[in-house]
Amino acid sequence: MSRFHFFILVLLVSISGFSQGMLLPVISIIFETNGESAAINGLHATGLYIGVLLASPFMEAPLRKLGFKPLIVMGGSIVILSLFGFIWLQSVWVWFLLRLFIGIGDHMLHFSTQTWVTSMSSKQNRGRNLSIYGLSFGLGFAAGPFMVPLVKLSPSLPFIVSGCISLFAWLFVFFLQNAYPETSPHETKSDNSFRRFYQAMLFGWVAFMPTFGYGFLETALNGSFPVYALRLGISVDAVAIILPAFAIGSIIFQFPLGILSDKYGRRNVLLVILLTGALCFFIAGVFPSPYVIGGCFFIAGMAVGSTFTLGISYMTDLLPPHLLPAGNLLCGITFSLGSILGPVAGGWYMQTFESANLFYFITLTLSSVWLALVLGKPKSWSPAETYSSSS
């Protein structure tokens, strides 16, 4: 993979991060201002991730048949059209459908670029390359919440800016030469996507726990935290600063953690960062002032902001090359399940319990993922065992 090729993939994922980082807080603020309930706000945020889940079972076969580039082109076009749709279609449930379409398009883009990077990276450089990939997404995601103040000028303005930037980045896709994922000589015509999903889950299930936890954390913070912060008396402008603090912390440590994972192992690094993140959110729950919360978000971002990319790297270490497309899809599926559960559970928690503390809820989630990694023992694979398990 050439540097220019890698740069285009990194650019695409950074713009995707920007649109996602903008959507969650902007729509949450618009709905809270319009008097929508926390439960509706949380449920609405699941639209993007429901789109991911709906599309996931049908992604692997087109990728193997068409290659990486066509899926990126189609995914990017769906995202761009949907972003501009927010400008013209003013309805809570139409916006939910637009979020769902963005989920489908974003997943096509992420799945293709992510599988392209993992399949082209050596084991020695995998952590570094995926950390750069994650860093680019984090940079975009960190920039997204800065669109929140534009809502004061016009509710449509954040969507216009995001749509135009996404269109510009999408045009670079046409400089890429198409390629196809690796296949195995042991595969037969009877092997299908669902069988490969089963094999990937059998040998790499423990690596999907961090991606689930990160999905829960990301949407709980970006979907439920703005509502929780407003109820604490924290201003919208302060929320626009606190939220990017997590992503900025993630950006700072994304690359060093990738290097450390190449040296000391993905599992060991994941155990340390998950425990650190849980402690940070516990402290934020005990001392809920804007300055303490901002500091805890920053430090937690330095730790758990790399959980998703380290989970992908760990999955790539555990699975054979021909199962990487299925493994990458399962990373996206588990991330989406966590992302759906995050805002729904967070919204329900805040609406049901009068003195609910969102940060304790997040602490419990991260601690549960840490415990799963401690107790989980991945199953080693061999070509003979892999195919006998599917027969």
Swiss-Prot record:
Membrane topology (UniProt): Multi-pass membrane protein
Gene from which the chain derives: yfkF
UniProt cross-references to InterPro entries, sorted A to Z: MFS (IPR011701), MFS_dom (IPR020846), MFS_trans_sf (IPR036259), MFS_YcaD-like (IPR047200)
Compartment(s) of residence: Cell membrane
Transmembrane segments: 7-27, 39-59, 66-88, 92-111, 131-151, 156-176, 197-217, 239-259, 269-289, 292-312, 329-349, 356-376
Gene Ontology terms for molecular function: transmembrane transporter activity
Keywords: Cell membrane, Membrane, Transmembrane, Transmembrane helix, Transport
Listed CDD domains: MFS_YcaD_like (cd17477)
PANTHER family the record matches: TRANSPORTER MFS SUPERFAMILY (PTHR23521:SF2)
Pfam family, one: MFS_1
SUPFAM superfamilies per UniProt: MFS general substrate transporter
Record flagged with keyword Hydrolase: no
Recorded superkingdom: Bacteria
GO cellular component labels: plasma membrane
Protein name: Uncharacterized MFS-type transporter YfkF
Family (UniProt): Belongs to the major facilitator superfamily.
